[in-house]
Amino acid sequence: MKKRVIILFLLFIFLLTTGFGCKLVDQKTQDAMKPINLNYWGVWNSQDDFTDILNAYKKLHPYITINYRKLRYDEYEKEIINALAEDRGPDIFSINNTWIKKYQTKITPMPATITMAYPVTKGAIKKEVVPELRTSKSLNLTDIKNNFVDAVYQDVVRQGFDEKNKQNKDSVYGLPLFVDTLAMYYNKDLLNNAGIALPPAFWNSEFQQAVKKTTIQDAQGGLIQSGTALGGSTNIERYSDILSALMMQNGAVMMDESNSVLFNRIPPAIKDQRYNPGLEALRFYTDFANPAKEVYCWNKNLGNSLKLFMQGKLAIFFGFSYHLPTIRAQAPKLNFGIAKFPQIEGNPPINFANYWVETVSNKSKYSSEAWDFIQFAARAEQAKTYLAKVKRPTALRSLINEQIDDQDIGIFAQQALTAKSWYKGADSAAAEQIFAEMIDTTVLAQDKIEDILNLAVGKVQQTVNVNGQ
């Protein structure tokens, strides 16, 4: 009998120390370490961009495999919507910051806590790796406010219905890996030739003089060289963002908390209640496409603003950091610089944010694991590696000072602290088209600018009201 007990004991020790220890782990832990495949869809990143993050995460959670798929922008939204409707969509997917409210019902918000299995080495003599369950707190609302630039909290924190507690509550619906901002690209040679030592910092007479000095017309009044890309619509990169930034800088309220579109109204905070900031911003913008104005430098017959800048025919171009690789690749000899987006002198600085967030589908069977990965990827130590590879401005406050001196992305990163955006409704593309119509109609009929502005606001409001969004 004694001999049998000794044999059984030795057998137990053998099983425990030869890799079969997991058999003795409780069922909950065994379930947590079963192989999991997370499908991740995006637009701008490649598999290589995420290699370092994926490898680092794999070391922590070897049983989780993340499959990244890059789609074309022009097919992305349609594919996402169809895939989610057919229950074949990704666990994690990227969306533009202005799409969050539109996709809110398709997203599982970040949970308060996440329980995950981690490999832990145990044993003094015979080392053995065994799984261990750990429950950790997710980022809370205060963390989002403190860790990320202000625009992030404004965009990713939304009120939704909490099924567990049967009440509305604020939750986090996505996290960004970067925040891009609108900046001023300028052709150094054209400014030098015009006797302009520094790019203008404000939208005042200095900017307008710079535009006049760098605009060249032929004998018939045709534009040979343009001082800046303002005043037009579809042939200007991100025209709606530029005009939105001008309106916000001038004091217009684009939308209130009740989702009412208001950029045609005079806000109560404006001292002169006869001054309409949204209307005057629209007038200022479209003056650059008005042949009767001294600052005339743009019309609908010109080519794309980015292409003209790369061809050396445009002195000042407004764009994001993502335009930089294109300029470098297609115009390697272009002598250009990057400066801050101009402001209204005497007003607090306001910049425009345009970025993407990573979020989790409410159809995912592994929402906790998906959110765990997103939070892991958004941490400073992981973000550093990613940002260095893709050359994008950070969304994290803690990394801004490290990027400020970067000649490529320093300006964009610094501006993130004062960047804002606004929700354009369930169909942001439709809202942008409404802005295009508003701009083009104003150029043709300046005397009807107030009616044009009011009509545009009404149309944008319709995009906001679709499906109760």
What would you call each of these model-derived segments?
Residues 2-8, 14-136, 298, 345, ...:
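Conserved N-terminal structural module of periplasmic/extracytoplasmic solute-binding proteins
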Residues 32, 157-160, 164-167, 332, ...:
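Long, aromatic- and glycine/proline-rich binding clefts that accommodate carbohydrate-like moieties
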Residues 65, 166, 181, 194, ...:
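Extracytoplasmic/periplasmic substrate-recognition and gating elements
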Residues 70-79, 203-209, 296-310:
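Short helix-initiation/N-cap motifs at beta->coil->alpha
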Residues 100-181:
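Hinge/lid segment of periplasmic solute-binding proteins
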Residues 113-147, 200, 219, 233, ...:
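Short, solvent-exposed loop/beta-turn-alpha elements that line the ligand-binding surface or hinge
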Residues 192, 384, 415-469:
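Conserved C-terminal helix/tail region of periplasmic/extracytoplasmic solute-binding proteins
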Residues 209-215, 246-299:
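Glycine-centered hinge/linker elements that transmit conformational signals in sensory
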